[in-house]
Amino acid sequence: HHSGFTDDRHYLWAATLDTSKIFIFDVHTNPNKPKLHKVITNFVKASGGIVGPHTTYALPGRMMISGLSNNQDFGGRTALVEYTNDGTYVATYHMPHDENLYGATKTGQIADGYGYDVRALPRRNVMITSSFTGWNNYMMNLGKLMGDSEAMKRFGNTVVVWDLHSRKPKKVFDVPGAPLEIRCAWGSQNNYCFTTTALTSQIWLIYEKDGEWNTESVATIGDPAKIPLPVDISITADDKHLWVNTWNDGMTRVFDISDPHNAKEVYTHKIGDQVNMLSQSWDGKRVYFTSSLLANWDKADGPEKMPQFFKAYHYKDGKLEQQFAIDFLKEKLGLPHQMRFGAYSLYAKSPKDGAKVAELSK
């Protein structure tokens, strides 16, 4: 499902939501020919029952993995799981919930113990997690899920701010409607992050003020009544704009976040029948999109006649211009979900002769 580089960019960790296996690829020895280095098959046992590893996030010498579920009831209560770069289990850090807050302060009405994404701001000694749903829900057919009123109650509604050094949760915030991807500002003085809620179509700001962390809804995405279903987001390198993809209507949107407390939509563009992840170049001139959300949730077909794709665009004068597209079903490539790009220039190492390395994108 998702993948992430280790801090030295030598290995790419790819996690699976159903089997809970984690595949570690050597992408350093020969970038032209990534090689399977190791498979972690005992994630559930080692972690104490965590199921559905999602985000594989690099910390110094470590990989922090966010779980989505557990092997007791396969619901949404879960944890963060830490490994060394070579794949050795370190520790499990449970998400705070009403029965055990693990020392955290509940700032609102909810402490559900759910998880999804994880990001960190080391300069502020902060780690942030969001919340989605458990194995029972994400493995269910989407139509069946939407028609099950009880299942629809089992989505996360919280964001948690952690102490990065101690790995202990500090504050639990009410962010209703399944907050998904977390993206943090790039500027060294910009101590804030964004997330979007899949079920309520809101952009939320997670920010520090006077040494305390807070959350605030700062914009509405499309028409929430039509369930556009915001998924991936990406902040431009100058911290002035936020890209937001909405899976259900296949749109991408750009919001002006020059004032992060007052986000304003400035551009929309139809990408396809559905759209999920995006990645943009550091200079902001290229944006890439993929289509698949989850195999059991994806649309079978639509007017665009290309339900599963990778599409590349130039972004110039505030508008997208498509350059090419790859039909993943036609090419029998499977379901395209996430992209990861790397650049030798960032790590001061020249590529080997003949190696073709993609430009760094975020």
Q: Where are the regions a protein language model picked out?
A:
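Short loop/turn segments that connect beta-strands within beta-propeller blades
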Residues: 27-30, 84-88, 164-167, 208-211, ...
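Surface-exposed loop and turn segments in beta-propeller and other repeat-based domains
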Residues: 37-49, 90-113, 169-180, 214-228, ...
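Structural signature of eukaryotic scaffold interfaces centered on beta-propeller domains
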Residues: 1-8, 52-59, 112-125, 182-189, ...
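Loop/turn-rich, solvent-exposed surfaces of beta-rich toroidal or solenoidal domains
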Residues: 193, 201-203, 224-304, 308-310
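Beta-propeller domains
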Residues: 108-253
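Short, conserved, GDST-rich strand-edge loop motifs in beta-rich repeat architectures
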Residues: 6-10, 66-78, 130-154, 290-310
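Asp-box/WD-like beta-propeller blade repeats and closely related beta-sheet repeat scaffolds
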Residues: 20, 27-121
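Residue-level signature of beta-propeller blades and closely related beta-rich strand-turn architectures
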Residues: 18, 28, 69-71, 132-134, ...
